[in-house]
Amino acid sequence: IQIGARNMQNFALLKRAGRARKPVLLKRGMSATLEEFLMAAEYIMSEGNYQVILCERGVRTFADHTRNTLDLSLIPAVQRLSHLPILVDPSHGTGKRNKVTPLSRAAVAVGADGLMVEVHNNPDRALSDGIQSIYPDQFDELMKQIRQIAAVVERYLPEPAASPSQNTVPAAARP
């Protein structure tokens, strides 16, 4: 179950998700503090569901160079205060394809437990999220870079089952 940023403080929904006994991905609200984010997770767990994964996806600021501002300082703060795993969504966290790779690398370096990245074989024709989606071959390259960073910060990444870069628009054909 994924609870998006706009529903992070929908307490009835959080409690219901807690009763579902399914893993819940909880995205941080657009202006939520660290405490509010963790307390939203508590609503889910108060119903007996401890399968909660947190996701930092950016907060609203006055910056105009990006759609949201990805708060990577949240990662070590959550890890200091909670046992819950925390992912980073650099796609929604920036809203811009060219920022996904560098912020993914930074998220891994700061200790994120995982990434949620938009990947599309032809982002310019995607029905949604195309502007923030990377191409499959870019994802392949990102994973190579992330593996190197993960090794430096002593994190483990499982080996992929298969490469997602099949059936993609060749780099030369991109706008």
Regions found by a protein language model. Give the residues of each.
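Surface-exposed amphipathic alpha-helices with a cationic face
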Residues: 18, 41-45, 76-82, 143, ...
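C-terminal helical cap(s) of enzyme catalytic domains, especially alpha/beta-barrels
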Residues: 122-155
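Catalytic beta/alpha-barrel core
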Residues: 1-11, 23-34, 53-57, 65-66
